[in-house]
Regions:
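Short beta-strand segments and strand-loop junctions that repeat across beta-rich extracellular domains
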Residues: 83-88, 125-129, 165-186, 222, ...
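Acidic/polar residues in short coil/turn loops that connect beta-strands
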Residues: 89, 120-123, 129-132, 188, ...
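Short coil/turn linkers that define WD40 beta-propeller blade boundaries
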Residues: 92, 133, 228-229, 337
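Beta-propeller and closely related beta-pinwheel folds
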Residues: 45-56, 96-103, 135-302
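Hydrophobic or amphipathic alpha-helical targeting/insertion segments
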Residues: 106-138
Length: 474
């Protein structure tokens, strides 16, 4: 007898092909976590607001208001296909009804006053003070807009359907005045035109590292400077943009967003693709042999994909195949450089909530708002690549062993382990035996030249395998 040990577990990595270069790197990792090399069920989602947002909810935002006494009130806001609603007094209330969707939001605070600014690029920009029953037009707004950012004490805005290449900025400390100032131009407002002459339009903007990044569908620009008299715009090297501007997320001094070929990374004046190629099934159309591969990123992702950064991880809600709505969430751990997928709920948008932004919320396709990272667990799966144990000769597997704990209602068989070769497969079940760690060893006999192992858990199961995976061969 010989033993083959996979000492720890990782996320998805198909960069080395289907045959194991690293057996710990999964072919598929769904609704699991591999933190610290352990394989565990991922925390799931539970309803945060059970009442569905009305009218085809598309986006989510959390607006916080703090009064003069320091009392903080948090409002969950949803953008629908034609309106913006807020949840308060136990129900959804309409703040504004427009003629289109795709809303953008920005919180602005001046002294003791907080306002929510929002727009869709078609209707007049609106603002809400957190107390009124409805929103009102933002006084002084020079145009329509749907992408907003705060940068050097000014509100920046773009996305006007009539001027798609124009970037507007307000006066310092005054979102209600966007006019220029002849006497002291450094205090005035104005606009900057950003044509690229290749058909690209602005898809989002964000402040990062003291500069302003403007994403376009075909490229990206960086605006730097502290006042109108020294603003300069440079085109970033890399020739990379995105049609999915809502996926933009910032961590530290770096911006991230989803493109058709992978995750874009913006650092300073350079934009590149995240150089790991671990997800060709999702981002490389030539990887799948089938036509219209259902596992690849949908070409329609620009109209629905969303992203956020939360606790050193990026979360991207994405559509697959030919879908026009999101069906999976891609999680990328920035510290460990690992990917896992989640499909418990179809997510339309994300938002952070709580005093320290410690809670991650998601807007589901059903219009409900969910809290992510709860005790609920979805069905989970982790699959190895093909393993040939270093030789193409015939081999026989005799057993596998996992060390850890399982918990499931009713102590029914809750984890299924499938060992497969080109000759067939063997299936064994593991029962929940309480919260204590235990050795789970199952015997079988299966011959072949190469093998792979699939570990699957039913919904509601909590598991954590801490000692890797051991295979016995002869």
């Amino acid at each position: 007898m010989a033993r083959y040990v996979i000492p720890y577990f990782e996320g998805v990595n198909e960069s080395a092909g289907e045959l194991a270069g690293n057996a710990a790197a999964a072919r598929l990792a769904r609704n699991v976590t591999t933190d610290y090399g352990r394989l565990a069920s991922a925390a799931g989602a539970s309803p945060y607001i059970e009442a569905p947002a009305p009218g085809g909810a598309q986006s989510l935002y959390v607006f916080c208001e703090t009064d003069a006494d320091g009392e903080r009130t948090e409002y969950v806001v949803a953008g629908t296909d034609s309106a913006v609603c807020v949840f308060r007094d136990g129900q959804w209330k309409t703040l504004y009804t427009g003629t289109a969707g795709d809303w953008g939001f920005l919180s602005y605070k001046k002294e003791d006053d907080s306002i929510l600014i929002f727009g869709n690029g078609v209707d007049p920009v609106q603002c809400w003070d957190g107390a009124s029953e409805t929103a009102t037009a933002l006084a002084g707004a020079p145009a329509k807009g749907k992408y907003f950012a705060l940068h050097y004490e000014r509100v920046w805005m773009c996305g006007d359907a009539e001027n798609p290449d124009r970037l507007y900025y307000s006066r310092m400390l005054d979102p209600n005045d966007w006019t220029g100032d002849v006497v002291t131009p450094e205090m005035g407002g104005g606009f900057v035109d950003l044509p690229t002459f290749d058909g690209g339009v602005i898809t989002n903007l964000y402040s990062v590292g003291g500069d302003l990044c403007i994403l376009k569908s075909t490229t990206a620009l960086l605006l730097y400077g502290t006042s109108p008299e020294n603003y300069q715009v440079t085109r970033m090297s890399g020739e990379l943009g995105t049609i999915a501007g809502r996926t933009a997320a910032v961590y530290g001094q770096t911006g991230y967003f989803v493109t058709a070929h992978g995750i874009g990374v913006q650092s300073g004046t350079t934009i590149v693709l995240l150089d790991d190629r671990k997800l060709p099934r999702l981002f490389d159309a030539t990887f799948c042999e089938e036509e219209n591969c259902a596992e690849g990123l949908s070409p329609h992702f620009g109209g629905c994909a969303a992203g956020i950064c939360f606790r050193e991880r990026l979360y991207f809600a994405l559509p697959l195949g030919q879908e026009t709505v999101n069906s999976i969430v891609l999680e990328y751990d920035l510290a460990r450089e690992t990917y896992v997928l989640h499909d418990e709920i179809a997510v339309r948008g994300f938002a952070r909530s709580g005093l320290m932004r410690e809670r991650l919320l998601a807007l589901g396709a059903d219009g409900k708002v969910y809290a992510l990272g709860t005790e609920n667990t979805a069905g989970a799966q982790w699959t190895t690549p093909w393993i040939d144990f270093g030789t193409s000769e015939e081999k026989v597997l005799r057993a596998f062993a996992l060390y850890g704990r399982l918990e499931s209602p009713g102590r029914r068989p809750c984890v299924r382990v499938t060992v497969e070769s080109e000759r067939g497969k063997k299936v064994r079940y593991l029962e929940a035996l309480g919260p204590r760690e235990k050795l789970y060893k199952r015997r079988f006999r299966l011959g072949g030249r190469r093998f792979r192992v699939d570990i699957s858990a039913v919904s509601g199961t909590r598991f954590c395998f801490t000692g890797g995976l051991e295979l016995e061969t002869e």
